[in-house]
């Protein structure tokens, strides 16, 4: 019985833990992120304003509009998509923050009935 109560108390304490998020600190700025292409690690940079996201990667520049849903979630849509798949908006959600970085997840903003739902995660570091 004591073990059960101890386990119950531990679970109760752990369930009250909430990840601290200061999402508004990461709404705008210059950020750096790592990604892999064919197993090769690369680093990209992006600049985000309240309404625009500009990506710099592999000597390319790409722009997207940004629409904030709340302090921790936004929808991003490419301004000049090059193909049909780039026309799809992406929903980003900041999961946790530290002093200079945040962890996020992203997925297609609109569900495609013919595709399996795919959620990816990443981390971005604020450099400016």
What are these regions (language model features)?
Residues 42-69:
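N-terminal glycine/threonine-rich, aromatic-flanked beta-hairpin/loop signature
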Residues 17-19:
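Bacterial signal peptide processing site
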């Amino acid at each position: 019985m004591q073990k059960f109560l101890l386990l119950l108390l531990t679970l109760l304490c752990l369930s009250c833990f909430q990840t601290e998020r200061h999402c508004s600190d990461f709404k705008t700025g210059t950020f750096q992120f790592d990604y892999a292409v064919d197993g090769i690690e690369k680093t990209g940079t992006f600049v985000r304003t309240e309404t625009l996201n500009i990506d710099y990667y592999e000597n390319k520049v790409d722009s997207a509009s940004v629409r904030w849903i709340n302090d921790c979630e936004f929808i991003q849509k490419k301004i000049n998509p090059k193909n049909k798949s780039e026309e799809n908006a992406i929903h980003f959600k900041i999961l946790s923050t530290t002093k200079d970085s945040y962890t996020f997840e992203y997925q297609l903003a609109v569900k495609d009935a013919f595709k399996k739902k795919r959620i990816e995660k990443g981390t971005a570091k604020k450099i400016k």
